Each structure stands twice: as structure tokens, then as C-alpha cells.
């Protein structure tokens, strides 16, 4: 490690250096991607129209400056995901936990990301959104439905093999403002 890298590490440790990262927000339509980004930017809930084309904005959380891309979740928009996700430092995948009828479609969509060799070590944060709604399934049920229990790497930020992808699920409610902060703290450890 050269002096420049050491200096940046020291400043980052002290919270005086801002890292930059590109984060892509994906998931099926109506999962809460745009609502979450609006909440992070404006600290207020707003009614958000379905995303028709990719949008980008910059956010600062802690010592990290995020360039975010909100990609639509409808079937046609998903065809554009690959050109964004392959250049990202991290992926936030939102799942509507109150709509288990779409779990299979969401699982297949997530599996396409997991199978993409360009993303083999890209951290993926899965936010199981809308857990506050009565019809929401438990996080454990969602994880089992997606068949990813063996891929989860733990919430503690444990040491991973260099070829291992950080992957974890956090329950949240974007509207009620809970759960996603823990997920972003976890993700920031891998950026």
C-alpha cells in the first residue's frame, strides 16, 4: 500500500475522507425503489409514479457519496439493468414482502443478477420491504422462497473469501422509515 492509499485509509477511518460508490437500485415494479430514493434524498415520503426510464442522483450517507441509479422494475425496463449493474459498486434489490404472488418472478430476476459473472463479487443488499403490511411474509419465508439461505453472508460484516459475494437480507418499511438504514450500513462495509 502506497502513502496515498494509506493516507486515504487514515482519513476514511477518521471520517474525514469521503468514498464514492455507484449503487444501483433494482427490483420488480412497485417494490419501493423510487420511494426509498425519494425518502433518502428529501427525508419525506412522497407519491412516486412508476419509473419509466433510469434516473440518477447523488446522495451522501456517512462518509460515502453515492451515485444512485433507480431502474424501473417493469418487464421492459429490466432489459436495461445489465448495462447499469455491471458498472456498479453495489446493488440494492428491493422485494415487496407483502406480495408473495410475485416472489417467483422476483426470485428469477434476482437469480439473473446472481448468475452474472461480472457481478461475482459485487455486494447485493436485499431489502424485504413493506414488512409493516399485514399480508407481509416473514423474512425467513421470503429467504426460503428465493432459495438463497445458503448464499447469505451474515449481517456482521464477517471476513469473506476474495471470491465470495457479500449478500444479505434486511427487513424494512420504507414508508415507516425503519430497517433500511441497517442495510445501508452493512452495504457500506463492502464498498
Curated annotation (Swiss-Prot):
Cystine pairings recorded for this chain: none
PROSITE patterns: SAR1 (PS51422)
One Gene Ontology molecular-function label: metal ion binding
Membrane-spanning ranges: none
Regulation: Small GTPases activation is mediated by guanine exchange factors (GEF), while inactivation through hydrolysis of the bound GTP is stimulated by GTPase activating proteins (GAP).
Amino acids binding GTP: 30, 32-35, 129-130, 132, 174-175
Keywords attached to this entry: Cytoplasm, Endoplasmic reticulum, ER-Golgi transport, Golgi apparatus, GTP-binding, Hydrolase, Magnesium, Membrane, Metal-binding, Nucleotide-binding, Protein transport, Transport
Residue ranges the record marks as coiled coil: none
Catalytic activity: GTP + H2O = GDP + phosphate + H(+)
Annotated segments matching region Mediates recruitment to ER membranes: 10-14
Binding site for Mg(2+): 29, 70
InterPro entries hit by this protein: P-loop_NTPase, Small_GTP-bd, Small_GTPase_ARF/SAR, Small_GTPase_SAR1
Family, per entry: Belongs to the small GTPase superfamily. SAR1 family.
Subunit structure: Homodimer; upon association with membrane. Part of the coat protein complex II/COPII, composed of SEC23/24 and SEC13/31 heterodimers, that it helps recruit and assemble on endoplasmic reticulum (ER) membranes at ER exit sites.
Full protein name: Small COPII coat GTPase SAR1
Gene (name only): SAR1
Amino acid at each position: 500500500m502506497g502513502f496515498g492509499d494509506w493516507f486515504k485509509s487514515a482519513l476514511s477511518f477518521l471520517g474525514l475522507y469521503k468514498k464514492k460508490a455507484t449503487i444501483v437500485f433494482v427490483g420488480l415494479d412497485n417494490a419501493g425503489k423510487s420511494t426509498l430514493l425519494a425518502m433518502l434524498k428529501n427525508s419525506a415520503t412522497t407519491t412516486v409514479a412508476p419509473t419509466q426510464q433510469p434516473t440518477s442522483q447523488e446522495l451522501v450517507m456517512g462518509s460515502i457519496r453515492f451515485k444512485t441509479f433507480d431502474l424501473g422494475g417493469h418487464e421492459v425496463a429490466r432489459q436495461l439493468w445489465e448495462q447499469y449493474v455491471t458498472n456498479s459498486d453495489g446493488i440494492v434489490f428491493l422485494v415487496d414482502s407483502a406480495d408473495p404472488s410475485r416472489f417467483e418472478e422476483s426470485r428469477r430476476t434476482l437469480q439473473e443478477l446472481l448468475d452474472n459473472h461480472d457481478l461475482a463479487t459485487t455486494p447485493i443488499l436485499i431489502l424485504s420491504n413493506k414488512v409493516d403490511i399485514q399480508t407481509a411474509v416473514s423474512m425467513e419465508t421470503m429467504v426460503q422462497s428465493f432459495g438463497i439461505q445458503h448464499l447469505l453472508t451474515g449481517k456482521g460484516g464477517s471476513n469473506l473469501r476474495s471470491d465470495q459475494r457479500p449478500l444479505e437480507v434486511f427487513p424494512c418499511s420504507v414508508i415507516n422509515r425503519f430497517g433500511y438504514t441497517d442495510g445501508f450500513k452493512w452495504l457500506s462495509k463492502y464498498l
